Amino acid sequence: MAPNPRKSHPLLKMVNNSLIDLPTPSNISAWWNFGSLLALCLMTQILTGLLLAMHYTADTTLAFSSVAHTCRNVQYGWLIRNMHANGASFFFICIYMHIGRGFYYGSYLHKETWNTGILLLLTLMATAFVGYVLPWGQMSFWGATVITNMFSAIPYIGQTIVEWAWGGFSVDNPTLTRFFALHFLLPFMIAGLTLIHLTFLHESGSNNPLGIVSNCDKIPFHPYYSLKDILGLTLLLLPLTTMALFSPNLLGDPENFTPANPLVTPPHIKPEWYFLFAYAILRSIPNKLGGVLALAASVLVLFLSPLLHKSKQRTMAFRPLSQLLFWTLVANLLILTWIGSQPVEHPFIIIGQLASTTYFIILLILFPITSALENKMLNF
């Protein structure tokens, strides 16, 4: 019998082991769809981004008008731009859901997969930030100024780092040029990291909602989960295209319809919605260095998840107290997101400080305590 090229060809064999004959737990729910949705988001962003880059000019005098030109004069340029801008929002929705799933079901106990995932999140955040600057609108410019300026809080070398990043003494043409270069490069870095992420995942195999070893009950990825993923893709593309076609500017900032002007500061500088929770944590601390450290900690705290896992059970499926705490954390993050979009005024300041404090308390203190308590209640 002739060998099956799918199983013998060096390249096809890799595809086969990752997407066709991959042994997959039979009970994984729709929460396991977000990995493939993120892959779809990445491919969509790279494709639309490439088409946009063909019409974009990375120069302070031309950037804004080149984006306007793309929307007005390029065939379907408006659609490409709207898909790219809103695709970023859906990318973040998917990655936050994906992280939430990992946290809820104890997937972080696959340490290498979890840690590469956090690196992917950080790279995605960097990509989104530099991309937001490219249209050179008011909020693009001032967002770039405020966020890059945070590095000046680093003792001794901070100011030098900021001026080195800017390529001068303020955000200007060199900054825009290098941000465009970075925005082009980073998605390919994300693609590379994704392969590493998957390599680590396929070492151990997927977790499942029960958190138990499922080696005795695995099914092939294709046709079962390939079909399930296609359903997920259509359900993601539907709201994305709807948004791009009907309300493309819903999540954008109106300030970005005004070209960047270094002489006029917008009344309220804020990043895109997906960074607001971290921005609220940054603002809740009156000290500059303290705020920057809290901002970094808000994401880097995820690295500690495997170390803070004290429960004898892997998932939260049968741990009602931890479930309550988890959804409190979700509500807390939504409050932080709302606070980040509000001006720095009386009720919002104290709410932001309380929400920031509870965010860290829940993650670092309450989760381990609750897990230990549940162990005791179950006589583990």
Curated annotation (Swiss-Prot):
Gene Ontology terms: cellular component: mitochondrial inner membrane; respiratory chain complex III
Cofactor (UniProt): heme b
Pfam families in the cross-refs: Cytochrom_B_C (PF00032), Cytochrome_B (PF00033)
InterPro entries linked to this entry: Cyt_b/b6_C (IPR005798), Cyt_b/b6_C_sf (IPR036150), Cyt_b/b6_N (IPR005797), Cytb/b6-like_sf (IPR027387), Cytochrome_b (IPR030689), Cytochrome_b_C_euk/bac (IPR048260), Cytochrome_b_N_euk/bac (IPR048259), Di-haem_cyt_TM (IPR016174)
Places the protein is found: Mitochondrion inner membrane
Record carries keyword Nucleotide-binding: no
Name of the protein this chain belongs to: Cytochrome b
UniProt lineage: Eukaryota, Metazoa, Chordata, Craniata, Vertebrata
